[in-house]
Amino acid sequence: MFNLKDKKVLLTGASGGIGQSIAELFSEAGAIVGLAARNEEKLKSLASSLKTKSYIFKFDLSNIENLETFVEEADKTMEGIDILICNAGITKDTLSMKMKTQDFKDVIDVNLTSTFILNRDMAKKMMRRRYGRIINMASIVGVLGNPGQANYCASKAGMIGMTKSIAQEYASRGITINCIAPGFIKTPMTDVLTDEQKSAMLSKIPEGKFGEPKDIANTAIFLASDEASYITGQTIHVNGGMLMV
């Protein structure tokens, strides 16, 4: 178990399956967790189950114009943030020939633009303390591409490139910035797939199984730890061998 005692973590997308798993694991390691998402009831339920102190921030990342205020509020409320995990994201899937420009823009705004603003504003605060860990949640499709997800793939590919750039800017200040690129992970989204769809996906995964949210949480807690202090600008692929790079 990694020791994150009294480290302060701000986690977006905290109400989903992966977010919940990350929050629980970080709390078990002693971290104080700030939970951010749109669904306040889910956040309250999650907060009540954690072993350490937590904070709830009801916020919609599509509200780009108020993101800077959100960062200030979270940092002030938690009295400084050591670890930022940008886990929130949306999809608006359809073939590119049918995709509305607004649907492309909406996904880019939530998945990429908001992540940039959070990285930029939080890194500036971390720089003053000469310590910080930032983890951005990318995706295997940001590298492979995926039909019907031009907007989502663009947002995740952009996130990977952005992370490399920002990581170079802050590496000398004690701040590491990395991506995690999950493959197919068991979530409510995979639960609704037909058996035929699941079989088609599993045939592409050498391990022959979907990942669990805890697989992503375990990767995140390593990147947030002191043991990962010499790792920055990287994309850690967690996909059962579906993509080997």
Located regions from the model:
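Conserved glycine-rich cofactor-binding loop
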Residues: 15-16
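Conserved glycine-rich Rossmann-like NAD(P)H-binding loop of the short-chain dehydrogenase/reductase
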Residues: 29-46
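Substrate-binding pocket helix/loop in short-chain dehydrogenase/reductase
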Residues: 95-96, 100-108, 190, 201
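Active-site helix of classical SDR
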Residues: 119, 155, 163
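Alpha-helical segment proximal to the catalytic Tyr-Lys
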Residues: 124, 168-172, 229
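Residue(s) in the substrate-gating loop at a strand-loop-helix junction
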Residues: 139
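Short, small/polar-rich loop/turn modules that mediate ligand/substrate recognition or access, typified
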Residues: 171, 176, 231-233, 239
